[in-house]
């Protein structure tokens, strides 16, 4: 009897189910504490299917992280290709990253887990993925928009790490008397912009 081949649509649906299940477990438990058996059970699939689609648990982990950032990065790269750098563009990119984390708490959980496990492969810190953003900072320095006595990579990491840390820890500050009556997110973003752009401008 001839075996029935899995249709491409079925294969893609299975792949998505595995990714969704792995994402949920990695965010809740971390990479090291999550087994392929747990992912298979949650995704209603088999370990053999997971290995077929992703080769290994590490391969699956990479794809889980990658898909949370891919749209943001590609959108920014498309904007970068339209012309010369401006302060408004950099400011909009900062706001877009802030909104990305604000609207995606699961991504924040994944970033927190990656940091706890010292995962150097995390997409947020991938050098190739961040290269267009570093280059944009460098262009802003060359055109006199930003100060040139600070490495462009430092400028990028300063602003992204401050924003990332805010979303990882903001619940800890929600009860501070100094912050009562404020919209915590919008107020913090405004402060980040003031400190970064005033300090980084030439």
Residue ranges, per PLM feature:
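C-terminal peripheral helix-coil segments that are non-catalytic and often amphipathic
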Residues: 1-3, 99, 103, 131-143, ...
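Helix-turn-helix
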Residues: 13-17, 21, 25-59, 63
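Conserved hydrophobic residue
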Residues: 31-32, 120, 146
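A contiguous binding-surface segment within folded domains or other stable secondary-structure elements
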Residues: 106-138
